[in-house]
Amino acid sequence: MKIRKSILAGTLAIVLASPLVTNLDKNEAQASTSLPTSNEYQNEKLANELKSLLDELNVNELATGSLNTYYKRTIKISGQKAMYALKSKDFKKMSEAKYQLQKIYNEIDEALKSKY
C-alpha cells in the first residue's frame, strides 16, 4: 500500500513539474486596453455634455437677474452639483446634474418668454 502511494505521489510530482503544466497559466488571453470601453466612452460623452452645459451657466445666471430669486438660487445649486459631479467622474451624479441643469435652463427660458 505504501509503495502504491509513493509511486502515485512521485508520478503526480513529475506531472506537475513538467513544462506543460507549469506554462498553462502564462497562456492567458489579455484584452487590449488601448481602445476605450463602452463605459469609458459613455462617461466621456456625458462629461463633455455636462461641460458644455456648465459653459452656459454664466449666461443663464445673468438672465435670472430680473426673475424670481428661486431661479438664481436653483441655478447656482445645480451648477455646484455639476462641478462636483465632473470632479467625481461618477456616471450617476453626472447624469443627475445634467438633467437638473437642462431642467432649470428650460424653466428660465420659459419664464423669460412669458415675462417678455
UniProtKB/Swiss-Prot annotation:
Keyword Secreted tagged: yes
Localisation per UniProt entry: Secreted
Location of region: Essential for activity: 62-79
Keywords: Secreted, Signal, Virulence
Listed GO CC annotations: extracellular region
Signal peptide extent: 1-31
Main location: secreted
UniProt keyword Hydrolase present: no
General function of this protein: Involved in countering the first line of host defense mechanisms. Efficiently inhibits opsonization, phagocytosis and killing of S.aureus by human neutrophils. Acts by binding and stabilizing human C3 convertases (C4b2a and C3bBb), leading to their inactivation. The convertases are no longer able to cleave complement C3, therefore preventing further C3b deposition on the bacterial surface and phagocytosis of the bacterium. Also prevents C5a-induced neutrophil responses.
Family label: Belongs to the SCIN family.
Name used for this protein in its record: Staphylococcal complement inhibitor
Annotated organism of origin: Staphylococcus aureus (strain MRSA252)
